[in-house]
Amino acid sequence: MNDKHLPDASAENPWLPLRQLTPARIALGRTGTSLPTRPQLDFQYAHAQARDAVHLPFDHAAISDGLRQRGRDSLLLHSAAADRHVYLQRPDLGRRLDEASVQRLREHAAGYDGQIDLAIVVADGLSALAVQRHTLPFLERLEEQALAEGWSLSPVVLVEQGRVAVADEIGELLRAKMSVILIGERPGLSSPDSLGLYFTWAPRVGLTDAYRNCISNVRLEGLSYGMAAHRLLYLMREACRRQLSGVNLKDEAEVQALEGEAPRTGNFLLARD
C-alpha cells in the first residue's frame, strides 16, 4: 500500500497566527479527522468553568470590605428568589426584592437627604465570578470620574440572586434619577467572567428591556474598566439632557485610547507591533 497520498496524522491550521488576537476557538488543528487532545481537554475545562460560574456563591462580604476600605458604604439585599435553584427556575422572582429588603431600603431612603443622581446596584446574576473579579476595579474608575463631574452616587446596593430588573425597584425606592446594575452575564465557553452594565433613566418597576442601555463584556480580555466607565458616563450625560434611556438613546461615545490602554484600530485582524 502506498501511503504517499495520505494526509498527515496531525496538522496545524494555517489560521494559527490569528489565535494571538482572540480567545475564540479557531485554528485548533487536527489529528486525523478529529481535534487534537489538547483542544478537546480545553473545551471540557471551559465548559466546567462556565457551569461553576453559574453556581458559585456570591462573596458579597469581600466586595463590601473592599468598598469599606475606600470609604464607600454598601447595603446588602436579597431578591424574592430564595435560593439558586429558585433563581434559575423563576426569573421573575429575581427581578423583585423580598419584603425584608424592601422594608430595609425604604428605611434607608427615608434617612437620606438630597437627590441621588445614580443608584449603583451589584447583583450576582449568572456569574458571581464576574462580579467578584471586576466590580471593585470598575467602580474605582467609575467613581473617580463621576465624582469629578459632580454626580451624586448612592451607597452600593448588593443583591443576592438578582436579575437585571431588580435595579428598577431599587432606583425607584431610592428616588434616584438613574440606575446602573453591575451583573454577571451568562458564561460563555471563553468568557466565564464577563460583567454586564445595564443603565436606566427614571427607574421604576415595570420597565422593559427597551428602556435600558447595555454595556457588555466588561473584563480584562474584553471592554476595559476605563472604557466601560467612559461609555456609562456618556449615557448618564445624554440621559439627563434628553430625559430618556434605552432604544432611543444610542451610545455614540467617542472611542479613544485611555491612559494605559492600547489604541483601537477598529479591526482585530490587524496586528499591532
Curated annotation (Swiss-Prot):
What EC number(s) would the UniProt record show?
A: 4.3.1.7
Is Membrane one of the keywords?
Answer: no
- Report the co-factor binding details: Binds between the large and small subunits.
Gene Ontology biological process terms in this record: amino acid metabolic process; ethanolamine catabolic process
Question: What catalytic activity is recorded?
Answer: ethanolamine = acetaldehyde + NH4(+)
Pathway in which this enzyme or protein is active: Amine and polyamine degradation; ethanolamine degradation
Q: Required cofactors, per record? A: adenosylcob(III)alamin
Task: Tell me where in or outside the cell this protein is found.
Answer: Bacterial microcompartment
GO cellular component: a single term = ethanolamine ammonia-lyase complex
Per UniProt, adenosylcob(III)alamin binds at V164, E185, C214
Q: What Pfam families would the database entry show?
A: EutC
Q: What is its main location?
A: other
Record keywords: Bacterial microcompartment, Cobalamin, Cobalt, Lyase
| Classification via Gene3D superfamilies | Ethanolamine ammonia-lyase light chain (EutC) (3.40.50.11240), Ethanolamine ammonia-lyase light chain (EutC), N-terminal domain (1.10.30.40)
The Swiss-Prot or TrEMBL record annotates one GO molecular function as: cobalamin binding
The top EC class, named as a word, is lyase
The entry describes its oligomerization and partners as: The basic unit is a heterodimer which dimerizes to form tetramers. The heterotetramers trimerize; 6 large subunits form a core ring with 6 small subunits projecting outwards.
Q: Which HAMAP family does this chain map to? A: EutC (MF_00601)
Instruction: Write out the function statement from the record.
Output: Catalyzes the deamination of various vicinal amino-alcohols to oxo compounds. Allows this organism to utilize ethanolamine as the sole source of nitrogen and carbon in the presence of external vitamin B12.
Matching entries from NCBIfam families are given as: PRK05465.1
Q: Which protein family is named in the record?
A: Belongs to the EutC family.
**This protein's name:** Ethanolamine ammonia-lyase small subunit
Q: Which organism is it from?
A: Pseudomonas aeruginosa (strain UCBPP-PA14)
Whichever gene encodes this chain, its name is: eutC
